[in-house]
Amino acid sequence: MSRYGLQKLYINGAYTDSTSGDTFDAVNPANGECIAQLQAANAQDVDKAVAAAKQGQPVWAAMTAMERSRILRRAVDILRDRNDELAAIETADTGKPLSETRSVDIVTGADVLEYYAGLIPALEGQQIPLRGSAFVYTRREPLGVVAGIGAWNYPLQIALWKSAPALAAGNAMIFKPSEVTSLTALKLAGIYTEAGLPAGVFNVLTGSGDQVGQMLTEHPGIAKVSFTGGIASGKKVMANAAGSTLKDVTMELGGKSPLIIFADADLDKAADIAMMANFYSSGQVCTNGTRVFVPQALQAAFEQKIVERVKRIHIGDPSDERTNFGPLVSFQHRDSVMRYIDSGKREGATLLIGGYSLTEGALAHGAYVAPTVFTHCRDDMQIVREEIFGPVMSILSYQSEEEVIRRANDTEYGLAAGVVTQDLNRAHRVIHQLQAGICWINTWGESAPEMPVGGYKHSGVGRENGISTLEHYTQIKSIQVELGSFNSVF
């Protein structure tokens, strides 16, 4: 018997057997252990979930703003009470260190839910005077039933980032977590029901993106799809959503973000920022600053500071409190990252440290790749052009501000960017020229609930978090009122 046993779908306020009875395994990437069996949804299950959502959504939307706010706030309290329990599940499912999941993943997800719970009463329309006898008023109304499709790197946090604004606006959601890391989304569904969310308002369907995800994006009963994942999958989701019923979409896709260090920067601070921008969550963060641009004159000194810091990383069992760097999410992904590392070696980048998977000792049975740093990289190298989604830093040298801005923008991606400098005039001047939706000055990675996040170019469509996201989960109804007489031309 696996640690977490058989996991069912969540439809209409209850854990429910899938129609097909098919299952797939959840595997702990730290040791290869099967920790759960998950049921796979099929077309009949999708129809059931949509029907339940259509029934529950009007009940939810009819509640007062304060009633909805209180229910979501209760869910926040439950999440915080069960923080350690959920963190342990997340660590077993993703391989992320417990020190990370316990302090970040559940905490920040709950923060976003609390933020939107507080915004519900602020969802207001406008009153627009036309003339003495006439005016227009607007209402922000929910879209109805929306779908969320999550990625594997922040399973619970992403489920909350998508469900919080959707539910706050009065919608129902059908959420499909990544088939690689599905466990905590199923726990979240039960928490929502326990908090008082009406049956059918939040459903979870587990299974593959090619099957369950595609069925959701094409289903005529769904009004919007919010997707987090890679560019190729995002384009497919967007095409299916538009080709079926002109669904609205939000896309949070990949990145190959530049981190620019200027000559006046504190090099120790710059090295610390570069480490967090590359090796947090074992490098599996879409906003990571994996293209690190350093002035040519400072390159050697910067490299030395990076190598010193990489040597201090504690790679180990994710359940060990001392560990701050765990395995990659799966053995398949480990092999993908290693192919990129091999490509960097072949194309002539200089390997400073790392560059191998751990195949001996206590961690040999896990999907571990050592933190890896390449230098003397070129813009045309595969490791510089493509998103690796792993612990691989590429250091590139530059000589002028104009040059580094041009090179930083020379990518199909536009998710994030950052600068490290003591000159705030330069910081703002450069940031305003970088083609990226999320930018940091003298820091990296923090995404507060109040901060809209999303990408330029191929890195996304729409935004998550912040007040503006509520606009993406509502539609405006305009009503004109005439208080005086009406004159017909007929």
Curated annotation (Swiss-Prot):
It catalyses: betaine aldehyde + NAD(+) + H2O = glycine betaine + NADH + 2 H(+). The modification Cysteine sulfenic acid (-SOH) is found at residue 286. The record marks 248 as: Seems to be a necessary countercharge to the potassium cations. NAD(+) binds at residues 150-152, 176-179, 230-233, 254, 286, 387. The keyword Metal-binding applies. K(+) 1 binds at residues 93, 180. K(+) 2 binds at residues 246, 457, 460. Its EC number is 1.2.1.8. It comes from the Bacteria. CDD domains: ALDH_F9_TMBADH (cd07090). Pathway: Amine and polyamine biosynthesis; betaine biosynthesis via choline pathway; betaine from betaine aldehyde: step 1/1. One of its GO terms (molecular function) is metal ion binding. SUPFAM superfamilies: ALDH-like. Keywords: Metal-binding, NAD, NADP, Oxidation, Oxidoreductase, Potassium. Involved in the biosynthesis of the osmoprotectant glycine betaine. Catalyzes the irreversible oxidation of betaine aldehyde to the corresponding acid. Belongs to the aldehyde dehydrogenase family. Dimer of dimers. This is Betaine aldehyde dehydrogenase. It comes from Yersinia pestis. The lineage of its organism: Bacteria, Pseudomonadati, Pseudomonadota, Gammaproteobacteria, Enterobacterales. The gene is betB.
